[in-house]
């Protein structure tokens, strides 16, 4: 117990009402957040002679100060607890690492509705279907829908400025509502209704309506129309046959848990209208000595209560673990949703199968994660030994990419003890240097990255510079001049020069710009982690450079035409659906673009042709 913190005096001031407490260490950092139905009773339990676990002992030993917030109800306390956990990220709480919002499929409320992926608050008028486990699942579904039900997926800015149909219409993946006369209002509305029913899980209704339309078309001797509808029916059937569907139109989340070697995996299975939309595995940060029950309870609370504004709550949540606050959680979620949410822990029938599936996926994902963790831990330990460091908790690597000195982009990738930390990857557009001067580019990106105060936890132990002696010299010069509050002896700078023929395994490493470097054996775990972070940095830089180059390519041709400034370039590209559409347009079509005269249209036409 802390010698500074007077627990007896503090407990005399604590009420027996429900509320939330925050525990602080000597540095004023929140180290734990908790809730209680009875604050006095709960806080008193921390200062008994026999504590429940080593984790609690370690926590209490660091307490310098406790803040208490009284609430009217337990539900308020539960919501406030998870808001505080998200705000402070206390090291003794179980923390949900990934709290980004889930993507939905959005069907807009426009005259001619469009389909799109949506994340975030649901302000736009229209319908939202989901949630889906990730953006990939949404994009796959949108691509599938485009083949079966060809309604538009273009932005409104493109749709409103079309004068003729785009490529999607030509290949049969859009009905072309942007151009009058290509599709009737009734036909487009019918396809939109099919999409609505399909995304709502009402496949049978879609098939029934399509079959009726096909039969009518056959009776009317409209055989081409009947054949088109037949193909649509077959496509819908192929999709529905591949889906795992329950007998009832279940709308639920299924949560399976696995726990081993101090690491937990929580696998969430998303089921809407009886169909498995997908799933995602989470690996919450678990303080040492934490019981599995606390992991599950905290995860479920954070998962639903912290992200409630961005997440559609299902009617039912299935768990394979009993929660002490199950009723409180269900009541809190019901209050947020404005309808009854059920939390079940002992399902039967199909629900038991779902739970077994989630549990199996959690165990499989945990085995994979532990294997990866073991590999990256071994590699970082080996590299620390090579570099004579006690440990490596964070590494950053830089690379430069350009084409003949144009569109230069620098990348910074970050590894921590668990491997790539992709949320902290960054790209930097480099400007104001001589084209092709990689040294100046490296100098600029390092100053932008490190020429300011950095949180202690984000100061890297090692910085890898891809490029050998010259680039390392730039890095050394930058760090010698930087006026930053942290120690100039940290981080360690390491240059990496590619081997002969740029073959992996032949890299030369440099601690200093002068003198000879050294190499590691091709089978060295230390070399493997260097190659991994170097390749990540290289790929990240190239990806950014290609995006920048593609953007410039779309406008560079127009930039040479007198009278076509940035606003007109943007209008031309939007109205024509891109540079290729503009190249294929006639003078008359170009002249219809707002702000383009007949004379300027002719100039643009001939400039693009020649």
Swiss-Prot record:
Its main location: cytoplasm. Keywords: Cytoplasm, DNA damage, DNA excision, DNA repair, Excision nuclease, SOS response. Residues 204-239 form the UVR domain. Coiled coil: none annotated. One of its GO terms (molecular function) is excinuclease ABC activity. InterPro entries: GIY-YIG_endonuc, GIY-YIG_endonuc_sf, GIY-YIG_UvrC_Cho, Hlx-hairpin-Hlx_DNA-bd_motif, RuvA_2-like, UVR_dom, UVR_dom_sf, UvrABC_protein_C. HAMAP family: UvrC. Belongs to the UvrC family. The UvrABC repair system catalyzes the recognition and processing of DNA lesions. UvrC both incises the 5' and 3' sides of the lesion. The N-terminal half is responsible for the 3' incision and the C-terminal half is responsible for the 5' incision. This is UvrABC system protein C. It comes from Salmonella paratyphi C (strain RKS4594).
């Amino acid at each position: 117990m802390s010698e500074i913190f007077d627990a007896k005096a503090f407990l005399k001031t604590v009420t027996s009402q429900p509320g939330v407490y925050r525990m602080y260490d000597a540095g004023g950092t929140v180290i734990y957040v908790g809730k209680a139905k009875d604050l006095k009773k709960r806080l008193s339990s921390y200062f008994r002679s026999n504590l429940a676990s080593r984790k609690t002992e370690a926590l209490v030993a660091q307490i310098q100060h406790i803040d208490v917030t009284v609430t009217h109800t337990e539900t308020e306390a539960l919501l406030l607890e998870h808001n505080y956990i998200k705000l402070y990220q206390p090291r003794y709480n179980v923390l949900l690492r990934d709290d980004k919002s889930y993507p939905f499929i959005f069907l807009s409320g426009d005259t001619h509705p469009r389909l799109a992926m949506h994340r975030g608050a649901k302000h736009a008028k229209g319908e939202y279907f989901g949630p889906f486990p990730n953006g990939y699942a949404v994009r796959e579904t949108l691509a599938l829908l485009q083949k079966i039900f060809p309604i538009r997926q273009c932005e409104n800015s493109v749709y409103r400025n079309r004068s003729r149909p785009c490529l999607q219409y030509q290949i049969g993946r859009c009905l072309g509502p942007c151009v009058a006369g290509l599709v009737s209002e009734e036909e487009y509305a019918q396809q939109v209704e099919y999409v609505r029913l399909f995304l709502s899980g009402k496949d049978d209704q879609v098939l029934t309506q399509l079959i009726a339309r096909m039969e009518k078309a056959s009776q009317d001797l409209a055989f081409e129309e009947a054949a088109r509808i037949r193909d649509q029916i077959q496509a819908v059937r192929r999709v529905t046959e591949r889906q795992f569907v329950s007998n009832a139109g279940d709308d639920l989340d299924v949560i399976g848990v696995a726990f081993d070697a101090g690491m937990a995996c929580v696998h969430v299975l998303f089921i809407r209208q009886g169909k498995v939309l997908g799933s995602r595995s989470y690996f919450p940060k678990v303080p040492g000595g934490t019981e599995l029950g606390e992991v599950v309870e905290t995860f479920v609370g954070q998962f639903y209560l912290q992200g409630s504004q961005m997440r559609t709550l299902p009617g039912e949540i299935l768990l394979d673990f009993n929660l002490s606050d199950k009723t409180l959680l269900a009541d809190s979620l019901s209050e947020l949703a404005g309808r009854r949410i059920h939390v079940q822990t002992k399902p039967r029938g199909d629900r038991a199968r779902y739970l077994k599936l989630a549990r199996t996926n959690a165990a499989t994902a945990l085995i994979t994660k532990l294997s990866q963790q073991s590999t990256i831990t071994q590699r970082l330990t080996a590299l620390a030994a090579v570099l004579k460091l006690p440990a490596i908790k964070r590494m950053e690597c830089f690379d430069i990419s350009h084409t003949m000195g144009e569109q230069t982009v620098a990348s910074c990738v970050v590894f921590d003890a668990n491997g790539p930390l992709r949320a902290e990857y960054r790209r930097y557009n480099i400007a104001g240097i001589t084209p092709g001067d990689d040294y100046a580019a490296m100098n600029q990106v390092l100053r932008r990255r490190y020429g300011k105060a950095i949180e202690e936890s984000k100061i890297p132990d090692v910085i890898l510079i891809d490029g050998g002696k010259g680039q390392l010299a730039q890095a050394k010069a930058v760090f010698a001049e930087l006026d930053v509050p942290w120690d100039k002896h940290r981080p360690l700078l390491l240059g990496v020069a590619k081997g002969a023929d740029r073959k992996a395994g032949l890299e030369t490493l440099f601690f200093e710009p002068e003198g000879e470097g050294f190499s590691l054996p091709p089978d060295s775990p230390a070399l493997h982690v260097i190659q991994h972070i170097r390749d990540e940095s290289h790929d990240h830089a190239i990806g950014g450079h290609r995006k920048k180059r593609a953007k410039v390519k779309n406008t560079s041709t127009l930039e040479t035409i007198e009278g076509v400034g940035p606003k007109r370039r943007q209008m031309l590209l939007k109205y024509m659906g891109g540079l290729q559409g503009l190249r294929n347009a006639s003078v008359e079509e170009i002249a219809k673009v707002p702000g383009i005269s007949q004379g300027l249209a002719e100039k643009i036409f001939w400039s693009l042709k020649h």
